[in-house]
């Protein structure tokens, strides 16, 4: 096995596959990519409708869980992370949401210089191949294919949800990834010709064809090799043997918001007290490693449907077989979508400059494991506040890489977070009570009409909320004078040369949306920084903000 490479990347996930492609693209640099998981060539990964299977599989995901969460009455929440080529982009719901422009301006305000929306937009566009073609906001010839699924044609509930939002006084948006995020409209997904567009399919497939690129699967990286606070390589276990490889230029951790923290701390980089408690000799005291952890929470807001038109009628094995057969033969139909084809982004209160609540609409009433919630037909929205104040941490518990780290999000630990949930439940109920839903809406399944007061909502949320699987921000970028900043504005680990982190852990704050799209964008921009390329020129495109955001929660008046 070759032992020396220009760049060593740990983790073939949403960011790592992008870096593998971009760093090897010129042919001038040798690149090694190490991945703990295996192949992504499974129908359960590649067929979009099968999304619940890989996420709950030991084969394809690290099945982490949180420590007992005090403000969720001691519940431990599921926290799966991808362990397969493509990482979490191979097990996620394929929803493509960049985030609001103001999220990235907020990053720069938090000390991540050069990461404002104007600087990030060109990299979102470079990554993307939008099915409707290039425009000022969307990319038309990038590796990552995005589309709108079946464009809401297979179920009238998608359009009814958008109409209900308009009747409730909210705007409609034709492209939440473009000029206007706020409002109700069609949802976008990472699917190409009916197949999941993971970063493995989009980026890694290109790198694999190059002689200067090497991929090793089934590898658990034990630690980063350091010499006098300089990263020189990695030590990893392969088929039961410890091996080493060395990096002439840089080591890059793209192991995710849990994995990158774990790797840095196992290597002696992190809060001194955490390292010593775990039995790891501190090499570099960096107190922010593992801190600032953030996530999105969500609930399933469910109703019976009065018409037999929902996906609940397709959950028997015979129907699943027909859907699978059509997909295998044509890559079309219900198998070719994640079923989230309409959505919304709204503000929960006046005075918010940009949305803090996100809706995914699903024409079915399901449980978290993908099974039916009840007998009969129903529909649901996945909903939750997306800009939490609560902050958590990730900490190793021993020097053994096989031991899962301690994960504590401190969910709902602030009064603002709890109030956002009360607002969220009440606003959702109001939206779904609009006339556009009358012909479909039956009895409210959950939360249920008996959940109405602050105390009732608080308790129901505690008992029913789940993670949206968006852990992030645990190795944040920040300014030189921020003692908790793990990275500088070029994703370089502070105090250690030739070492970067590039994944969702670098976010200073969690954006209003799913994480795959911004993670890919970060990797695209980081690749240019690593290669010392001139960054793409900033793009000064206009962004819609509600004209009366300072004084009004929405732009219109509800019909009901």
UniProtKB/Swiss-Prot annotation:
Q: What class of enzyme is it?
A: oxidoreductase
Read off the Gene3D superfamilies from this record.
FAD/NAD(P)-binding domain, Glucose Oxidase, domain 3
Q: Give, as in the UniProt entry, the pathway in which the protein acts.
A: Amine and polyamine biosynthesis; betaine biosynthesis via choline pathway; betaine aldehyde from choline (cytochrome c reductase route): step 1/1
Species classification:
Bacteria, Pseudomonadati, Pseudomonadota, Gammaproteobacteria, Vibrionales
Keyword Flavoprotein annotated: yes
Q: Which cofactor does it need?
A: FAD
Task: Name the PROSITE patterns for this protein.
Answer: GMC_OXRED_1
- Is the keyword Flavoprotein in the record? yes
Tell me the protein's name.
Oxygen-dependent choline dehydrogenase
Looking up Pfam families in the UniProt record yields: GMC_oxred_C, GMC_oxred_N
Q: Where is the active site?
A: 470 (proton acceptor)
- What family is this? Belongs to the GMC oxidoreductase family.
Q: Which GO terms describe its cellular component?
A: membrane
Q: Membrane-spanning regions, if any?
A: none
């Amino acid at each position: 096995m070759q032992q020396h490479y220009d760049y060593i990347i740990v983790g073939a996930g949403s960011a790592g596959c992008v870096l593998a492609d971009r760093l090897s693209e010129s042919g001038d640099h040798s690149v090694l990519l190490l991945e703990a998981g295996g192949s992504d060539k499974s129908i359960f990964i590649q067929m979009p409708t099968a999304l619940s299977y890989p996420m709950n599989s030991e084969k394809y995901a690290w099945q982490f869980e949180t420590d007992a969460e005090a403000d969720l009455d001691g519940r431990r929440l599921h926290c799966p992370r991808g362990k397969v080529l493509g990482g979490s982009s191979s097990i996620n719901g394929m929803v493509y949401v960049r985030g609001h422009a103001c999220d990235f301006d907020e990053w720069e305000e938090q000390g991540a210089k050069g990461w404002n929306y104007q600087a990030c937009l060109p990299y979102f566009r470079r990554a993307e191949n939008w099915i409707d073609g290039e425009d000022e906001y969307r990319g038309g010839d990038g590796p990552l294919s995005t589309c709108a699924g079946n464009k809401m044609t297979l179920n009238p509930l998608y359009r009814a949800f958008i109409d209900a939002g308009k009747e409730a006084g909210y705007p409609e948006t034709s492209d939440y990834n473009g000029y206007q995020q706020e409002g109700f409209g069609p949802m976008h997904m990472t699917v190409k010709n009916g197949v999941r567009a993971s970063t493995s399919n989009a980026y890694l497939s290109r790198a694999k064809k190059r002689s200067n690129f090497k991929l090793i699967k089934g590898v658990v990286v034990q630690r980063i090799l350091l010499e006098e606070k300089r990263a020189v390589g990695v030590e990893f276990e392969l088929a039961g043997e410890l091996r080493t490889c060395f990096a002439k230029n840089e080591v890059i951790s793209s192991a995710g918001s849990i994995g990158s923290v774990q790797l840095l701390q196992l290597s002696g980089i992190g809060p001194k007290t955490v390292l010593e408690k775990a039995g790891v000799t501190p090499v570099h005291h960096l107190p922010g490693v593992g801190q600032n952890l953030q996530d999105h929470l969500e609930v399933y807001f469910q109703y019976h449907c009065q018409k037999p038109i929902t996906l609940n009628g397709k959950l028997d094995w015979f129907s699943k077989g027909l859907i699978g057969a059509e997909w295998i033969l044509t890559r079309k139909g219900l198998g070719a979508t994640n079923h989230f084809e309409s959505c919304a982004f709204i503000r929960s209160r006046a005075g918010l400059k940009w949305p803090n609540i996100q809706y995914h609409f699903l024409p079915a009433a399901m449980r978290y494991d993908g099974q039916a919630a009840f007998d009969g037909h129903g529909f649901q929205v996945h909903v939750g506040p997306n800009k939490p104040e609560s902050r958590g941490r990730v900490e190793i518990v021993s020097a053994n890489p096989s031991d899962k780290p301690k994960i504590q999000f401190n969910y709902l630990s602030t009064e603002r977070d709890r109030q956002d949930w009360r607002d969220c439940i009440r606003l959702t109920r109001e939206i779904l009570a609009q006339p556009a839903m009358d012909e479909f809406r039956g009895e409210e399944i959950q939360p249920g009409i008996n959940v109405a007061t602050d105390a009732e909502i608080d308790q129901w949320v505690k008992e029913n909320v789940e993670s949206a699987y968006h852990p992030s921000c645990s190795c944040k970028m920040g300014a030189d004078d921020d003692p908790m900043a793990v990275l500088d504005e070029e994703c370089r680990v502070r105090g250690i040369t030739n070492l970067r982190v590039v994944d969702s852990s670098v976010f200073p704050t969690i954006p209003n949306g799913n994480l795959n799209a911004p993670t890919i964008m970060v990797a695209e921009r980081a690749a240019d920084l690593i290669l010392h390329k001139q960054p793409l020129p900033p793009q000064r495109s206009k962004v819609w903000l509600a004209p009366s955001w300072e004084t009004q929660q929405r732009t219109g008046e509800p019909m009901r």
